[in-house]
Regions:
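Catalytic machinery of carbohydrate-active enzymes
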Residues: 1-386
Protein backbone atom coordinates (compact mmCIF):
# COMPACT_ATOMS: atom_id res chain seq x y z
CA UNK A 1 0.00 0.00 0.00
CA UNK A 2 1.39 3.40 -0.99
CA UNK A 3 1.57 6.25 1.50
CA UNK A 4 0.88 9.88 0.61
CA UNK A 5 1.50 13.21 2.34
CA UNK A 6 -2.00 13.29 3.73
CA UNK A 7 -1.06 10.24 5.82
CA UNK A 8 2.20 11.65 7.19
CA UNK A 9 2.36 11.11 10.91
CA UNK A 10 4.51 12.79 13.50
CA UNK A 11 6.77 9.97 14.59
CA UNK A 12 9.83 9.54 16.77
CA UNK A 13 13.19 9.72 14.96
CA UNK A 14 14.33 6.51 13.30
CA UNK A 15 16.71 4.66 15.62
CA UNK A 16 19.48 2.26 14.63
CA UNK A 17 18.23 -0.20 17.22
CA UNK A 18 14.96 -0.69 15.31
CA UNK A 19 16.55 -1.35 11.91
CA UNK A 20 17.05 -4.92 10.72
CA UNK A 21 16.53 -4.34 7.01
CA UNK A 22 17.06 -1.40 4.64
CA UNK A 23 16.19 -0.68 1.02
CA UNK A 24 18.24 2.04 -0.68
CA UNK A 25 16.44 3.62 -3.63
CA UNK A 26 18.99 5.24 -5.93
CA UNK A 27 18.16 4.43 -9.53
CA UNK A 28 20.73 6.34 -11.59
CA UNK A 29 22.90 7.90 -12.97
CA UNK A 30 26.43 6.51 -12.83
CA UNK A 31 27.89 9.44 -10.90
CA UNK A 32 24.98 9.59 -8.47
CA UNK A 33 25.30 5.87 -7.75
CA UNK A 34 29.04 6.27 -7.10
CA UNK A 35 28.22 9.13 -4.72
CA UNK A 36 25.94 6.81 -2.74
CA UNK A 37 28.60 4.14 -2.12
CA UNK A 38 29.99 5.88 1.01
CA UNK A 39 26.49 5.85 2.54
CA UNK A 40 26.21 2.13 1.80
CA UNK A 41 29.54 1.45 3.50
CA UNK A 42 28.61 3.49 6.56
CA UNK A 43 25.26 1.74 6.91
CA UNK A 44 26.93 -1.67 6.70
CA UNK A 45 29.62 -0.79 9.27
CA UNK A 46 27.02 0.49 11.72
CA UNK A 47 24.55 -2.32 11.01
CA UNK A 48 26.73 -5.38 10.34
CA UNK A 49 23.87 -7.87 10.72
CA UNK A 50 21.16 -5.96 8.85
CA UNK A 51 19.80 -6.86 5.43
CA UNK A 52 20.68 -4.09 2.95
CA UNK A 53 19.21 -4.14 -0.56
CA UNK A 54 19.54 -1.56 -3.36
CA UNK A 55 16.94 -0.70 -5.99
CA UNK A 56 18.63 0.58 -9.17
CA UNK A 57 18.04 0.95 -12.89
CA UNK A 58 19.88 -1.29 -15.33
CA UNK A 59 22.30 1.26 -16.80
CA UNK A 60 24.26 1.81 -13.57
CA UNK A 61 23.63 -1.56 -11.90
CA UNK A 62 27.03 -3.01 -12.83
CA UNK A 63 28.70 -0.59 -10.41
CA UNK A 64 27.11 -2.14 -7.32
CA UNK A 65 26.72 -5.78 -8.33
CA UNK A 66 28.96 -7.93 -6.18
CA UNK A 67 29.39 -5.25 -3.52
CA UNK A 68 30.22 -6.93 -0.20
CA UNK A 69 27.94 -4.57 1.73
CA UNK A 70 24.81 -5.60 -0.20
CA UNK A 71 22.52 -8.57 0.25
CA UNK A 72 20.57 -8.03 -2.95
CA UNK A 73 20.47 -5.76 -6.00
CA UNK A 74 16.99 -5.21 -7.44
CA UNK A 75 17.22 -4.02 -11.05
CA UNK A 76 14.54 -1.97 -12.79
CA UNK A 77 14.65 -2.15 -16.60
CA UNK A 78 12.36 0.87 -16.92
CA UNK A 79 13.84 2.29 -20.12
CA UNK A 80 13.61 -1.05 -21.93
CA UNK A 81 10.06 -1.60 -20.69
CA UNK A 82 9.00 1.82 -21.91
CA UNK A 83 10.61 1.17 -25.29
CA UNK A 84 8.87 -2.21 -25.62
CA UNK A 85 5.49 -0.71 -24.83
CA UNK A 86 5.81 1.79 -27.68
CA UNK A 87 5.43 0.16 -31.10
CA UNK A 88 6.60 -3.27 -30.01
CA UNK A 89 5.11 -6.73 -30.23
CA UNK A 90 6.56 -7.63 -26.83
CA UNK A 91 3.93 -5.98 -24.65
CA UNK A 92 2.79 -9.26 -23.09
CA UNK A 93 6.34 -10.39 -22.28
CA UNK A 94 7.22 -6.95 -20.96
CA UNK A 95 4.19 -6.90 -18.70
CA UNK A 96 5.24 -10.26 -17.24
CA UNK A 97 8.73 -8.87 -16.60
CA UNK A 98 7.28 -5.85 -14.81
CA UNK A 99 5.05 -8.03 -12.64
CA UNK A 100 8.03 -10.25 -11.77
CA UNK A 101 10.04 -7.15 -10.86
CA UNK A 102 7.25 -5.83 -8.60
CA UNK A 103 6.97 -9.23 -6.93
CA UNK A 104 10.70 -9.16 -6.20
CA UNK A 105 10.50 -5.57 -4.94
CA UNK A 106 7.66 -6.42 -2.56
CA UNK A 107 9.07 -9.75 -1.38
CA UNK A 108 10.74 -8.14 1.65
CA UNK A 109 9.19 -6.12 4.46
CA UNK A 110 11.83 -3.48 5.20
CA UNK A 111 12.26 -1.63 8.45
CA UNK A 112 13.53 1.37 6.50
CA UNK A 113 13.27 2.53 2.88
CA UNK A 114 15.50 5.49 1.93
CA UNK A 115 14.65 7.43 -1.23
CA UNK A 116 18.01 9.01 -2.05
CA UNK A 117 16.98 9.73 -5.64
CA UNK A 118 14.15 12.17 -4.99
CA UNK A 119 12.21 12.07 -8.28
CA UNK A 120 8.74 10.79 -9.13
CA UNK A 121 10.08 7.53 -10.57
CA UNK A 122 11.90 6.74 -7.31
CA UNK A 123 9.03 8.00 -5.18
CA UNK A 124 6.58 5.68 -6.93
CA UNK A 125 8.82 2.66 -6.34
CA UNK A 126 9.37 3.75 -2.74
CA UNK A 127 5.61 3.79 -2.35
CA UNK A 128 5.27 0.33 -3.92
CA UNK A 129 7.98 -1.20 -1.73
CA UNK A 130 6.93 -2.70 1.60
CA UNK A 131 8.49 -0.64 4.36
CA UNK A 132 7.65 0.32 7.94
CA UNK A 133 9.45 3.68 7.68
CA UNK A 134 10.08 5.54 4.41
CA UNK A 135 12.29 8.60 4.50
CA UNK A 136 13.55 11.24 2.05
CA UNK A 137 14.60 14.87 1.79
CA UNK A 138 13.12 18.29 1.14
CA UNK A 139 15.29 18.78 -1.97
CA UNK A 140 13.35 15.99 -3.69
CA UNK A 141 11.27 16.98 -6.72
CA UNK A 142 8.27 15.93 -8.82
CA UNK A 143 6.13 15.12 -5.80
CA UNK A 144 8.29 12.18 -4.73
CA UNK A 145 7.95 13.10 -1.05
CA UNK A 146 4.26 12.19 -1.26
CA UNK A 147 5.28 8.54 -1.03
CA UNK A 148 7.19 8.90 2.25
CA UNK A 149 5.78 7.72 5.57
CA UNK A 150 6.82 10.90 7.37
CA UNK A 151 7.81 14.50 6.61
CA UNK A 152 11.07 14.80 4.62
CA UNK A 153 14.27 15.91 6.29
CA UNK A 154 15.52 19.40 5.49
CA UNK A 155 18.88 19.54 3.72
CA UNK A 156 20.62 22.37 1.88
CA UNK A 157 21.20 20.85 -1.54
CA UNK A 158 22.99 23.76 -3.17
CA UNK A 159 25.98 24.23 -0.85
CA UNK A 160 26.93 20.60 -0.18
CA UNK A 161 28.59 17.96 -2.26
CA UNK A 162 26.32 15.04 -3.12
CA UNK A 163 28.40 12.59 -1.06
CA UNK A 164 28.05 14.78 2.02
CA UNK A 165 24.32 15.21 1.42
CA UNK A 166 23.79 11.48 1.21
CA UNK A 167 25.91 10.83 4.29
CA UNK A 168 23.60 13.15 6.23
CA UNK A 169 21.10 10.27 6.01
CA UNK A 170 23.47 8.18 8.11
CA UNK A 171 23.93 11.10 10.51
CA UNK A 172 20.18 11.36 10.96
CA UNK A 173 20.06 7.66 11.81
CA UNK A 174 22.82 8.10 14.39
CA UNK A 175 25.57 6.33 12.44
CA UNK A 176 29.28 6.91 12.85
CA UNK A 177 30.32 8.27 9.43
CA UNK A 178 34.04 8.69 10.10
CA UNK A 179 35.29 5.71 8.09
CA UNK A 180 34.60 4.89 4.41
CA UNK A 181 36.47 4.72 1.10
CA UNK A 182 33.72 4.65 -1.55
CA UNK A 183 35.62 2.42 -3.96
CA UNK A 184 33.90 0.40 -6.67
CA UNK A 185 34.45 -3.35 -6.16
CA UNK A 186 36.49 -5.04 -8.90
CA UNK A 187 37.72 -8.63 -8.98
CA UNK A 188 40.35 -10.73 -10.73
CA UNK A 189 38.23 -11.20 -13.86
CA UNK A 190 38.20 -7.43 -14.44
CA UNK A 191 41.93 -7.15 -13.76
CA UNK A 192 42.76 -10.05 -16.10
CA UNK A 193 40.80 -8.41 -18.90
CA UNK A 194 42.84 -5.26 -18.39
CA UNK A 195 46.05 -7.31 -18.38
CA UNK A 196 45.15 -8.58 -21.86
CA UNK A 197 44.23 -5.09 -23.04
CA UNK A 198 47.50 -3.63 -21.74
CA UNK A 199 49.56 -6.36 -23.45
CA UNK A 200 47.69 -5.86 -26.73
CA UNK A 201 48.34 -2.10 -26.73
CA UNK A 202 51.86 -2.22 -25.23
CA UNK A 203 50.83 -0.21 -22.17
CA UNK A 204 52.64 -2.08 -19.40
CA UNK A 205 55.13 0.10 -17.59
CA UNK A 206 54.01 3.23 -19.45
CA UNK A 207 52.77 6.49 -17.95
CA UNK A 208 49.16 6.92 -18.99
CA UNK A 209 46.87 9.91 -19.38
CA UNK A 210 43.25 8.85 -19.81
CA UNK A 211 40.84 11.23 -21.53
CA UNK A 212 37.07 10.91 -21.26
CA UNK A 213 35.71 13.57 -23.63
CA UNK A 214 31.99 12.84 -23.75
CA UNK A 215 28.97 13.79 -21.60
CA UNK A 216 25.21 13.41 -21.90
CA UNK A 217 24.53 17.15 -21.84
CA UNK A 218 25.57 19.06 -24.95
CA UNK A 219 26.48 22.03 -22.72
CA UNK A 220 29.11 19.97 -20.86
CA UNK A 221 31.07 19.14 -24.01
CA UNK A 222 34.45 20.60 -24.94
CA UNK A 223 35.20 21.02 -28.65
CA UNK A 224 36.58 17.82 -30.28
CA UNK A 225 39.55 19.57 -31.92
CA UNK A 226 40.70 20.78 -28.50
CA UNK A 227 40.83 17.21 -27.23
CA UNK A 228 42.80 16.29 -30.38
CA UNK A 229 45.33 19.06 -29.77
CA UNK A 230 45.58 18.23 -26.07
CA UNK A 231 46.24 14.55 -26.80
CA UNK A 232 48.94 15.47 -29.33
CA UNK A 233 50.71 17.66 -26.77
CA UNK A 234 50.59 14.92 -24.15
CA UNK A 235 52.15 12.45 -26.58
CA UNK A 236 54.75 14.82 -28.03
CA UNK A 237 55.79 16.90 -25.02
CA UNK A 238 55.30 14.57 -22.07
CA UNK A 239 55.96 11.23 -23.74
CA UNK A 240 52.91 9.64 -22.11
CA UNK A 241 50.44 7.19 -23.62
CA UNK A 242 46.93 8.51 -24.20
CA UNK A 243 43.80 6.39 -23.67
CA UNK A 244 40.35 7.60 -24.70
CA UNK A 245 37.45 6.10 -22.73
CA UNK A 246 33.74 6.16 -23.46
CA UNK A 247 30.70 4.03 -24.24
CA UNK A 248 29.98 2.34 -27.58
CA UNK A 249 27.64 5.26 -28.36
CA UNK A 250 30.65 7.58 -28.04
CA UNK A 251 32.65 5.70 -30.67
CA UNK A 252 31.94 8.06 -33.62
CA UNK A 253 32.87 11.15 -31.58
CA UNK A 254 36.08 9.55 -30.31
CA UNK A 255 37.01 8.44 -33.82
CA UNK A 256 36.60 12.07 -34.92
CA UNK A 257 38.94 13.21 -32.13
CA UNK A 258 41.55 10.60 -33.07
CA UNK A 259 41.33 11.54 -36.77
CA UNK A 260 42.00 15.15 -35.79
CA UNK A 261 45.31 14.24 -34.14
CA UNK A 262 48.74 14.53 -35.77
CA UNK A 263 49.91 11.39 -33.98
CA UNK A 264 48.68 7.80 -34.13
CA UNK A 265 49.71 6.73 -30.65
CA UNK A 266 46.35 7.19 -28.87
CA UNK A 267 44.27 4.15 -27.89
CA UNK A 268 40.49 4.39 -28.34
CA UNK A 269 38.72 2.12 -25.82
CA UNK A 270 35.17 3.38 -26.44
CA UNK A 271 32.72 0.51 -26.00
CA UNK A 272 35.44 -2.07 -25.31
CA UNK A 273 35.16 -2.34 -21.53
CA UNK A 274 32.41 -2.29 -18.91
CA UNK A 275 32.08 -0.07 -15.86
CA UNK A 276 33.98 -2.41 -13.54
CA UNK A 277 36.87 -2.70 -16.01
CA UNK A 278 36.79 1.08 -16.38
CA UNK A 279 37.14 1.44 -12.61
CA UNK A 280 40.07 -0.97 -12.62
CA UNK A 281 41.61 0.84 -15.61
CA UNK A 282 41.66 4.19 -13.84
CA UNK A 283 43.71 2.68 -11.00
CA UNK A 284 46.46 2.12 -13.59
CA UNK A 285 46.34 5.65 -15.02
CA UNK A 286 48.39 8.62 -13.84
CA UNK A 287 45.54 11.05 -14.50
CA UNK A 288 42.10 11.36 -16.07
CA UNK A 289 41.13 14.48 -18.04
CA UNK A 290 37.37 14.58 -18.37
CA UNK A 291 34.15 16.48 -18.73
CA UNK A 292 31.55 16.42 -15.95
CA UNK A 293 30.28 12.87 -16.42
CA UNK A 294 30.02 9.45 -14.77
CA UNK A 295 33.59 8.26 -15.48
CA UNK A 296 34.89 11.35 -13.67
CA UNK A 297 33.28 10.08 -10.46
CA UNK A 298 34.44 6.52 -11.10
CA UNK A 299 38.05 7.72 -11.39
CA UNK A 300 37.79 9.84 -8.24
CA UNK A 301 36.34 6.89 -6.33
CA UNK A 302 39.30 4.76 -7.45
CA UNK A 303 41.83 7.42 -6.31
CA UNK A 304 42.90 8.36 -9.84
CA UNK A 305 43.82 12.08 -10.01
CA UNK A 306 41.21 13.93 -12.05
CA UNK A 307 41.36 17.13 -14.10
CA UNK A 308 37.71 18.03 -14.67
CA UNK A 309 36.36 20.57 -17.16
CA UNK A 310 33.24 22.23 -15.75
CA UNK A 311 30.79 24.61 -17.41
CA UNK A 312 27.05 24.59 -16.67
CA UNK A 313 27.23 22.59 -13.43
CA UNK A 314 28.57 23.24 -9.92
CA UNK A 315 31.77 21.40 -8.93
CA UNK A 316 31.11 22.04 -5.23
CA UNK A 317 27.98 19.90 -5.63
CA UNK A 318 29.04 17.23 -8.11
CA UNK A 319 32.75 17.67 -8.75
CA UNK A 320 35.42 15.00 -8.23
CA UNK A 321 35.39 14.33 -4.48
CA UNK A 322 38.54 14.11 -2.41
CA UNK A 323 42.10 15.39 -2.56
CA UNK A 324 44.41 15.49 -5.56
CA UNK A 325 41.87 16.64 -8.16
CA UNK A 326 41.73 19.84 -10.22
CA UNK A 327 38.60 21.56 -11.56
CA UNK A 328 38.96 23.96 -14.49
CA UNK A 329 36.09 26.35 -15.09
CA UNK A 330 35.40 29.90 -16.24
CA UNK A 331 34.22 32.34 -13.57
CA UNK A 332 31.14 33.64 -15.37
CA UNK A 333 27.98 35.23 -14.02
CA UNK A 334 25.83 32.71 -15.89
CA UNK A 335 27.65 29.65 -14.54
CA UNK A 336 26.46 27.37 -13.11
CA UNK A 337 23.17 27.53 -15.02
CA UNK A 338 22.36 23.77 -15.06
CA UNK A 339 21.01 24.12 -18.60
CA UNK A 340 21.18 21.26 -21.09
CA UNK A 341 20.99 23.65 -24.07
CA UNK A 342 22.79 26.94 -24.67
CA UNK A 343 23.29 29.14 -27.73
CA UNK A 344 26.84 30.27 -26.90
CA UNK A 345 28.47 27.78 -24.46
CA UNK A 346 30.91 30.46 -23.34
CA UNK A 347 31.74 28.58 -20.15
CA UNK A 348 33.23 25.62 -22.04
CA UNK A 349 34.64 27.54 -24.99
CA UNK A 350 36.59 29.75 -22.59
CA UNK A 351 38.66 26.77 -21.41
CA UNK A 352 41.82 26.68 -23.55
CA UNK A 353 44.02 23.71 -24.44
CA UNK A 354 47.00 25.48 -22.87
CA UNK A 355 45.18 25.93 -19.58
CA UNK A 356 44.31 22.24 -19.38
CA UNK A 357 47.83 21.21 -20.39
CA UNK A 358 49.34 23.48 -17.75
CA UNK A 359 47.06 21.94 -15.11
CA UNK A 360 48.18 18.50 -16.27
CA UNK A 361 51.86 19.43 -15.87
CA UNK A 362 51.23 20.70 -12.35
CA UNK A 363 49.34 17.52 -11.55
CA UNK A 364 52.17 15.32 -12.82
CA UNK A 365 54.89 17.39 -11.12
CA UNK A 366 53.67 16.12 -7.79
CA UNK A 367 54.36 12.49 -8.67
CA UNK A 368 56.66 12.40 -11.72
CA UNK A 369 60.21 11.00 -11.54
CA UNK A 370 62.87 13.72 -11.73
CA UNK A 371 64.09 12.71 -15.20
CA UNK A 372 60.58 13.05 -16.63
CA UNK A 373 60.04 16.36 -14.90
CA UNK A 374 63.25 17.77 -16.38
CA UNK A 375 63.07 16.15 -19.81
CA UNK A 376 59.40 16.77 -20.39
CA UNK A 377 57.95 19.42 -18.14
CA UNK A 378 60.53 22.17 -18.60
CA UNK A 379 60.48 21.92 -22.39
CA UNK A 380 56.71 21.75 -22.36
CA UNK A 381 56.28 24.69 -20.01
CA UNK A 382 57.45 27.16 -22.66
CA UNK A 383 54.32 26.44 -24.67
CA UNK A 384 51.99 25.43 -21.88
CA UNK A 385 49.65 28.39 -21.90
CA UNK A 386 49.16 28.70 -25.65
Amino acid sequence: MMQFSGFWKKRSPVSLSEIRSILIVKLSAIGDVVHTLPLLEVLRKNLPDARIDWLIEEEASEIIKGHAALNRVIVSRRKLWQKNFVGSGRKSTTLKEIMSFLKELRSEQYDLVIDIHGLFKSGLLTGLARGRRKIGFTWAREGSTLFLSEPPFFEDQYRQHAIERYLKTANILGCDVASWNGRIPVDDSHRKMLDRLFRKNDLNGKRIAAINPMAKWDTKLWEPDRFSRLADRILEELGMRVLFTGSRHDQPALQEICRGMRNEGAVNLAGQIGLKELAALYTRCDVLITTDTGPMHIAAAMNCPVIALFGPTAPWRTGPYGNGHKVIREDLGCSPCFKKACSHKTCMKGITVGRVFYALMKQLDHKAPEKIRIAGHRRASLRALR
